[in-house]
Each structure stands twice: as structure tokens, then as C-alpha cells.
Amino acid sequence: MVEQSDRAPLLDWEEIPPAELAPSVPSPDTGDSLQSGLSSYPTEATLGADITLNTSPTRPSSVAAVHSPHKQHSGPGGDALAEEDEPGDCAFHGLSVRDRRITGWEEKDQIVAVFVVTFDTRSGNMIEWCLPHDVNLEGVEFKSMASGSHRISSDFIYFRKGCYFGLACFANMPVESELERGARMKSVGILSPSYTLLYRYMHFLENQVRHQLQCPGQYSPLEAFYEDKKAVLPSGGNGLVTACPTSALAPIVNRCMHPEMKITHPAGCMSQFIRFFGEQIMVLWKFALLRKRILIFSPPPVGVVCYRVYCCCCLANVSIPGMGVSVPEFRPFFYINVADIPALETELSYVACTTEKIFEEKKELYDVYIDNQNVKTHRESLQPLLRLNSADREKYRKLCEQRQLLLYSQEVDGDCTSNEEDLFILFFMEQNNRIFQTLSEVAVSADPTLTAEHVRAMGLDPQGDRGFLVDLLEIYGIDVMLVIDNPCCP
């Protein structure tokens, strides 16, 4: 039995009329269209030298001196900001004129592969068709059709395949066929070196998956799409694309330590994230800054959960040049399944989501596990970070207060120059900048001692956040003396 997708109300988008079904096939109830995705934002770049670490044997016993070796990490490049929608016709059903405009590599040559995945009652998930024909799509048949998707009518999925990122649209249509056991399930997706512009093709993929359900085997629109958008990337010599073009992914805008991420669709993504987790956002914020491995579990639909992955990444933005080059990149994996276990075993930091409950038992693969609104960790050293302190509640109060002021100005004054996404991203970026700016100034001062006054000025609790600060100093390689009085001592 197919159930209607239970997306949160704040994540319902513009309705897209379903394509007309063939007379012999019943029309599915596909619900609202999922016309949305991740907007563009820059990704991490090497920004300069980090703060040098040293420890002094002459420091008193009440001082925590933190030392950490430096390691260089780099990540995939990004793209320029997306432009506004423009009216007009387009060659591909579902692509706007804006989507087809060519203004440089960031606007063209994005698509590494186009594919159709189907569920076969005898063979399971399988690649039905793809371009180019020799591209390595091993595992994509499971990434683009999440486990448990047979219970919903439609979904969309962001995922990672090697150094590429994918977006697939899934649909489930009832059919009068014993061979297909009453349901036809397919996904149509694309791969790209960057995930920042994948959302542009969401509408096209939705229309194409409906087309494939009604007219299986008709790939002409997908072939034309690929020829128009195909990437020109270096070859590994065997006809397979194996490397991302670093020159093509060169910085276009100013970079931060972590991507300055901005979502423009769907409206309400950040609002839903805040309402869903409430004060626990402050717990997630600390884990994100500490570059922990965060895994989010949820049953399908998984598209909404991919946005939670995105929102978690937004918590770790820092715009101070040179800060964070010694820490692992906080990598969004988006949707993962059991086939990704070997890749996760070598990851130092990531945030991902899954529909497979078995991951909860694989404790060696994650540091933080989120099931619904339940945030937990099996690591004893991280247990104290699950407890909210007064500074956490004060920050959350300020965030909610700023949201209310923004909503009031939008409703009363008609001020639409800012939105909740901007507010959310800037709120945490400013908080992070304040912390690292203070730590940097103390580290290079004549007396590199971090006092309770410094900690309060950073918006942290001198007692409740002491363990968090110790971990932060170690991970980011900042050499300061942390001196905080013990409340139990006179």
C-alpha cells in the first residue's frame, strides 16, 4: 500500500500539475511537487596559516594547555550564486530559461551523468539506463531510491558518489500488472561535481520520473538534457570520469572556513529546523563546531531530512581568514545506506542521514546519532555536551527573538530584504566568529590566558562549556591557557 508523503507543512512547495497518465494506468496521488533544492554557496578553501601550537611545562596545574598536530584538508569547490527566475519557454519540460542560461563553467557543463533507476521485483534496485554508458554508477541504484521508499508516493534525495554529488527524484505509481506486483517505482537523477546548483534541475527530474513511469524506455528528453549540460572533465584513461576539475572549481567569491551556505528553496527550511529541534540546536551547534560525525536517522521521505543535513552544516560557518585549515572539512554526505559503510570508516568528520536503522548499531561509524528529536552520543567524553547550560538557553532565546522581530517587520512593514535563512546563517556565523576572534587575540597576546571574562564575552558558560572549550582548542590547534575557577573551591 502506498501512503502519501508526510512532509512537514513548512516544507510544502508550489504545486506542479502531474502529467497526464496513459488510459490503461491508474493515476497516482503524487501530492505536492518537491520543486526545491540546495542553493549555491562557496565551499572551503585554504585560507592561510593557522595559529601555532605550543605547550609550556611551567604552566600551573590548574591550567589546561592544549596541543594538536596540524593536518591539511581540502574539499570540493563551489559555484557562483544562483540568479533569479525569469519567465519564458524552454526546450526541456521542467527547465526554466534561468536554468539554461550559460554564464561560465559554473552555469554549464555541470552534469557528469544522467540515469534512470528502477525497482525490479526479481533483481531489486538496478540501473535501467544512463549516459554516458561507461560511467561508473556502482551503488547509485541504492542511493537514489532510499530503503523504505515503497511506502511513499514521491521523494527526492541528495547523495554523494565519490567526489560527485547527486540529486534523484523518486516516484511510485500503482499499475495493473502482476509482474510489477501492482506498483512501478523509478528514480531519475543526475551527478555533478558540485551540489550547489543541483536544485535547478529538480523540476525537470520530477517531470522525467513521471514520464518514465508512464512511458518506460523513452529516454530522448534525458539524452537531449545530457548533451546540453554534460560536463567536460578529465578522463582517467579508461573512458571513466575519475577526477574533479580543480581549475574549473576555482574560487569565485570570498571563501569561509566552511561553506557560506544559503538555501532559497524551500522557504521555511530553517524555520522547520528550528521548530523541530528547539533548544537542542545549541547542542548540534557544538558538535558541528567540533567536527563530529553526525548521523540523522528518519524513515522516508528522506528529502526533508537532507535539508536537516544542510542546516547542521550551516551551524559551523566561520568567516575569519586562516581559521580552521587544520581541522577536517565538515562534509555533507546527505543520504547514505549500508553500501557507504566502507567510505564512512575513513571519514573524520561528516553529517549524513539514513533510513536504515541498522546504522544505530554501527557505533564505530558515528559520534552523534539523531533519531527524531533525540540527540545522543555513545562517547562518554561527549556526554556533557548533551546538557544545555544557561548560556545555551540565552543564545537560543536571542535567536528566537531575532526571528520574531524579522517576522514582525516582514508582516507589518513589508520588509523582505532579509529572510529566516539569512538570519539563521548569520546568527551562528557571528557567534562562531566571536569565539574564534577572541581565542585568536588571546593566543597572540603577551599573556595567553583565557579567563572566565573572556569565556562570557564569547557567549559561553565558564563552567558548563569548559569541556567544550578544551576540545575546541585542541581540535583547532589554538595555544592558550584556560583558567577557570572551580566553583567548589573558595
From Swiss-Prot:
Which portions of the chain have biased composition (kind: Polar residues)?
30-43, 52-61
List membrane-spanning regions: none
Q: Which superkingdom does the taxonomy of this entry point to?
A: Eukaryota
Q: Where is the dDENN domain?
A: 399-490
As recorded in UniProt, coiled-coil segments are none
Domain uDENN span(s) in chain numbering: 19-221
Family matches, as InterPro entries: DENND11/AVL9_GEFs (IPR051731), LCHN/Anr2 (IPR018626), Tripartite_DENN (IPR037516)
Q: Briefly, what is this protein's role?
A: Probable guanine nucleotide exchange factor (GEF). May promote the exchange of GDP to GTP, converting inactive GDP-bound small GTPases into their active GTP-bound form.
Q: Which Pfam families match?
A: DENND11
Q: What is the lineage of its organism?
A: Eukaryota, Metazoa, Chordata, Craniata, Vertebrata
Question: Can the keyword Magnesium be found in this entry's annotation?
Answer: no
Protein name stated in the entry: DENN domain-containing protein 11
Organism annotation: Danio rerio
One GO location term (cellular component) = cytoplasm
Give a yes or no for keyword Transport in this entry: no
